[in-house]
């Protein structure tokens, strides 16, 4: 048999998609395929697509079209493949395969079949697969950080969200499986493990009959990794037991990523959020009291169908009052196949854009003040890269999660992938600036 083809992967979308990408790379490398970062040199390009909102789809389509124009053999994977497999095959003759979110672990078989001239469609209608610690994985993050998926899929049916259709219902891994993978990551030198799923606070509900996040955090606390960070914690799932586990487990960062989406009870009911109108001041204040120094990140959707000016003002006041450390704002995106798509009272895009801009303008001085509070402190920073032009090191303190939050720009010398003390001397609304604290 001749030499195996080389394969490049173009990764788009969220960190859940990134883990899928890393498993595909691991499986291909184990099977003896050459993996190249240069798409021009590769025989096949796997495009791991995102289909969460319209702008993500546009980026995916743009990438696919560019590769098609370069006459590449394209394997389309990820959420867009799950969502639009028929249209993609019809419109892109260069696509040799379409692989769904529950089928990426069969990527080696897909390439083998494509090599035989078959046009492969492998899309499970209801994804049920979840990789575990035995699935090969080739990490694409910086050496000090790794994402760790604790569960896949979602049992909630929020009116705006297509994720359950794209990723299936929730399926959790066992605590033992997650701990085993965490130990593998630590052996690779990982300093920060970021726990992800669709709803991390619901972890374990499907396999244990009740959420087991507190038990998971305590188990991971016994592992020799400096930082454990959680993403996607629903406020109603932050029970006294979970809060106690965060407090009692030294390597769990007091960083809470709360996808609140809105503050007004009527909008939350329209969104079919699981807590309906229970996102209120009491929940946020309880968290701040229970975990002093907690860093709170959240995301909001503005312009949900029927959102009135008064309801938007309620959101503005909520954000002003609680002074979150980090806020992401999305304008509502009408997704075909979701209940919100059919709602008659859709808002014009210009109204949504204006509301997004107003909310971001309100948050900016809050973020600036929060960062100014770090000036003068010596903080632990995970060094991730070096700017070759300026010589400055770039990293993150525990306040910042990768890609969504700010960074710390550092003068001095340090090894990439290590956590070092840095004295912060200045800050803007996004980033911190500091100097390595020498050990002499």
From Swiss-Prot:
<feature type="binding site">
    <location>
        <position position="161"/>
    </location>
    <ligand>
        <name>[4Fe-4S] cluster 2</name>
    </ligand>
</feature>
<keyword id="KW-0408">Iron</keyword>
<dbReference type="InterPro" id="IPR020612">
    <property type="entry name" value="Methylthiotransferase_CS"/>
</dbReference>
<feature type="binding site">
    <location>
        <position position="14"/>
    </location>
    <ligand>
        <name>[4Fe-4S] cluster 1</name>
    </ligand>
</feature>
<dbReference type="GO" id="GO:0005829">
    <property type="term" value="C:cytosol"/>
</dbReference>
<dbReference type="InterPro" id="IPR005839">
    <property type="entry name" value="Methylthiotransferase"/>
</dbReference>
<feature type="domain" description="Radical SAM core">
    <location>
        <begin position="140"/>
        <end position="370"/>
    </location>
</feature>
<dbReference type="GO" id="GO:0103039">
    <property type="term" value="F:protein methylthiotransferase activity"/>
</dbReference>
<keyword id="KW-0004">4Fe-4S</keyword>
<dbReference type="InterPro" id="IPR002792">
    <property type="entry name" value="TRAM_dom"/>
</dbReference>
<keyword id="KW-0949">S-adenosyl-L-methionine</keyword>
<keyword id="KW-0963">Cytoplasm</keyword>
<dbReference type="InterPro" id="IPR012340">
    <property type="entry name" value="NA-bd_OB-fold"/>
</dbReference>
<dbReference type="GO" id="GO:0006400">
    <property type="term" value="P:tRNA modification"/>
</dbReference>
<dbReference type="InterPro" id="IPR007197">
    <property type="entry name" value="rSAM"/>
</dbReference>
<dbReference type="InterPro" id="IPR038135">
    <property type="entry name" value="Methylthiotransferase_N_sf"/>
</dbReference>
<feature type="binding site">
    <location>
        <position position="158"/>
    </location>
    <ligand>
        <name>[4Fe-4S] cluster 2</name>
    </ligand>
</feature>
<dbReference type="InterPro" id="IPR013848">
    <property type="entry name" value="Methylthiotransferase_N"/>
</dbReference>
<comment type="similarity">
    <text>Belongs to the methylthiotransferase family. RimO subfamily.</text>
</comment>
<feature type="binding site">
    <location>
        <position position="79"/>
    </location>
    <ligand>
        <name>[4Fe-4S] cluster 1</name>
    </ligand>
</feature>
<dbReference type="Pfam" id="PF04055">
    <property type="entry name" value="Radical_SAM"/>
</dbReference>
<feature type="domain" description="MTTase N-terminal">
    <location>
        <begin position="5"/>
        <end position="116"/>
    </location>
</feature>
<dbReference type="GO" id="GO:0046872">
    <property type="term" value="F:metal ion binding"/>
</dbReference>
<dbReference type="GO" id="GO:0051539">
    <property type="term" value="F:4 iron, 4 sulfur cluster binding"/>
</dbReference>
<feature type="binding site">
    <location>
        <position position="50"/>
    </location>
    <ligand>
        <name>[4Fe-4S] cluster 1</name>
    </ligand>
</feature>
<dbReference type="Pfam" id="PF00919">
    <property type="entry name" value="UPF0004"/>
</dbReference>
<dbReference type="Pfam" id="PF18693">
    <property type="entry name" value="TRAM_2"/>
</dbReference>
<keyword id="KW-0479">Metal-binding</keyword>
<protein>
    <recommendedName>
        <fullName>Ribosomal protein uS12 methylthiotransferase RimO</fullName>
        <ecNumber>2.8.4.4</ecNumber>
    </recommendedName>
</protein>
<feature type="binding site">
    <location>
        <position position="154"/>
    </location>
    <ligand>
        <name>[4Fe-4S] cluster 2</name>
    </ligand>
</feature>
<keyword id="KW-0411">Iron-sulfur</keyword>
<feature type="domain" description="TRAM">
    <location>
        <begin position="372"/>
        <end position="438"/>
    </location>
</feature>
<dbReference type="InterPro" id="IPR005840">
    <property type="entry name" value="Ribosomal_uS12_MeSTrfase_RimO"/>
</dbReference>
<dbReference type="GO" id="GO:0035599">
    <property type="term" value="F:aspartic acid methylthiotransferase activity"/>
</dbReference>
<dbReference type="InterPro" id="IPR006638">
    <property type="entry name" value="Elp3/MiaA/NifB-like_rSAM"/>
</dbReference>
<dbReference type="InterPro" id="IPR023404">
    <property type="entry name" value="rSAM_horseshoe"/>
</dbReference>
<keyword id="KW-0808">Transferase</keyword>
<comment type="function">
    <text>Catalyzes the methylthiolation of an aspartic acid residue of ribosomal protein uS12.</text>
</comment>
């Amino acid at each position: 048999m001749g030499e195996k083809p080389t394969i490049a992967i173009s990764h788009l979308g969220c960190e859940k998609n990134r883990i899928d990408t890393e498993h595909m790379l691991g499986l291909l490398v184990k099977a003896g395929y050459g993996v190249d970062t240069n798409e021009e040199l590769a025989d096949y390009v796997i495009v791991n697509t995102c289909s969460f909102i319209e702008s993500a789809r546009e980026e995916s389509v743009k990438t696919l079209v560019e590769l098609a124009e370069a006459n590449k053999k394209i394997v389309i994977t990820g959420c867009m493949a799950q969502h639009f497999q028929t249209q993609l095959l019809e419109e892109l003759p260069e696509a040799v395969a379409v692989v769904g979110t529950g089928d990426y672990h069969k990527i080696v078989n897909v390439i083998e079949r494509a090599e035989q001239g078959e046009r492969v469609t492998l899309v499970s209608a209801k994804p049920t697969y979840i990789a575990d610690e035995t699935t090969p994985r080739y990490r694409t993050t910086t050496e000090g950080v790794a994402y760790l998926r604790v569960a896949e899929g979602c049992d909630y049916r929020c009116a705006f969200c297509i994720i359950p259709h794209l990723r299936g219902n929730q399926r959790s891994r066992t605590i033992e499986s997650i701990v085993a993978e965490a130990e593998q990551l630590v052996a690779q030198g990982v300093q920060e493990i970021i726990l992800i799923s669709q709803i991390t606070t619901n972890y374990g509900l499907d396999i244990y009959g009740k959420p087991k996040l507190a038990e998971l955090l305590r188990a991971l606390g016994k592992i020799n990794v400096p930082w454990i960070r959680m993403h996607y914690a629903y406020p109603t799932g932050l029970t006294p037991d979970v809060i106690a586990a965060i407090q009692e487990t030294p390597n769990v960062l007091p960083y809470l990523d709360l996808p609140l989406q809105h503050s007004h009870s009527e909008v939350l009911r329209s969104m079919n959020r699981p807590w309906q109108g229970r996102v209120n001041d009491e929940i946020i204040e309880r968290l701040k009291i229970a975990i002093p120094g907690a860093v709170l990140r959240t995301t909001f959707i503005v312009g949900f169908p029927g959102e009135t000016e008064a309801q938007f003002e309620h959101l503005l006041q909520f954000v002003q009052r609680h002074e979150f450390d980090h806020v992401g704002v999305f304008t509502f995106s009408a997704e075909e196949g979701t209940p919100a798509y059919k709602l008659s009272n859709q808002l014009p895009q210009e109204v949504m854009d204006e509301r997004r801009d107003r909310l971001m303008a309100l948050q900016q001085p809050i973020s600036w003040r929060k960062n100014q509070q770090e000036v003068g402190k010596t903080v632990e920073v995970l060094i991730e890269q070096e700017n070759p032009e300026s010589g400055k090191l770039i990293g993150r303190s525990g306040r910042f999660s990768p890609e969504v939050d700010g960074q710390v720009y550092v003068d001095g010398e340090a090894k990439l992938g290590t956590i070092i003390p840095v004295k912060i001397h200045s800050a803007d609304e996004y980033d911190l600036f500091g100097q390595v604290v020498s050990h002499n």
